[in-house]
């Protein structure tokens, strides 16, 4: 923007000539042409506002016309609102010094959120970790047990434990041969009186145990039971006694 000594044209309005003369009296000789228009607009708005306020004050005082006292009061009130400057620095320092001399109030113990007592607050862990017990490689394995007691006439029934789940690692086991073991137990029947030896037939009972329950080997338990053919003679001892008496008479 170019600036220089501006002179209003001779055919300019009277208000523009007056504003140019005011700027010249204040020592302002270089300005843009639009400055005069802005100053005229500002002066018109300011004068209109002052006259409106003076009219309000005059009507409040119940005066028939607006006089100079009303205009002075309106200018004084408008000057306090429109043309204000910040207070001096020394004045602000004095006010700040007086404020800082006043100690701050103590912090209240119940400041912040009102929490219940500590025993009702979940501010600490209320649980305990339980360590897991690791099972060894031999734990949980079933071991076959055979109990040998007194020989009786009744065959003993082997008891098998309840199968349990055993975790097997994902490894390929080496091939192994499955062998079977045979146990032969001969159980003679109980006799109260000596009798003559009579050929008897032997009944064999085989009991096969599942290998998955006891181990990699199959165990075959064989029980031999001697059945007597002269059960009728033992059941009727009087008849046998009569036969022996007849033999003695013949002799």
UniProtKB/Swiss-Prot annotation:
The gene is TAF9B. Belongs to the TAF9 family. The modification Phosphoserine is found at residues 147, 177. Residues 229-251 are annotated as: Disordered. Pfam families: TFIID-31kDa. Keywords: Acetylation, Nucleus, Phosphoprotein, Transcription, Transcription regulation. It comes from Homo sapiens (Human). Essential for cell viability. TAF9 and TAF9B are involved in transcriptional activation as well as repression of distinct but overlapping sets of genes. May have a role in gene regulation associated with apoptosis. TAFs are components of the transcription factor IID (TFIID) complex, the TBP-free TAFII complex (TFTC), the PCAF histone acetylase complex and the STAGA transcription coactivator-HAT complex. TFIID or TFTC are essential for the regulation of RNA polymerase II-mediated transcription. GO terms for biological process: DNA-templated transcription initiation; negative regulation of apoptotic process; negative regulation of intrinsic apoptotic signaling pathway in response to DNA damage by p53 class mediator; negative regulation of transcription by RNA polymerase II; positive regulation of cell growth; protein stabilization. PANTHER family: TAF9 RNA POLYMERASE II, TATA BOX-BINDING PROTEIN (TBP)-ASSOCIATED FACTOR, TRANSCRIPTION INITIATION FACTOR TFIID SUBUNIT 9B. The modification N-acetylmethionine is found at residue 1. The keyword ATP-binding does not apply. It is found in: Nucleus. It comes from the Eukaryota. Binds TAF5 and TAF6. Component of TFIID and the TATA-binding protein-free TAF complex (TFTC). TFIID is composed of TATA binding protein (TBP) and a number of TBP-associated factors (TAFs). Binds N-terminal domain of p53/TP53 which is essential for transcription. This is Transcription initiation factor TFIID subunit 9B. Signal peptide: none annotated. GO terms for molecular function: protein heterodimerization activity; RNA polymerase II general transcription initiation factor activity; transcription corepressor activity. One of its GO terms (cellular component) is nucleoplasm. The modification Phosphothreonine is found at residues 159, 174. InterPro entries: Histone-fold (IPR009072), TFIID-31 (IPR003162), TFIID_subunit_9 (IPR051431). Its main location: nucleus.
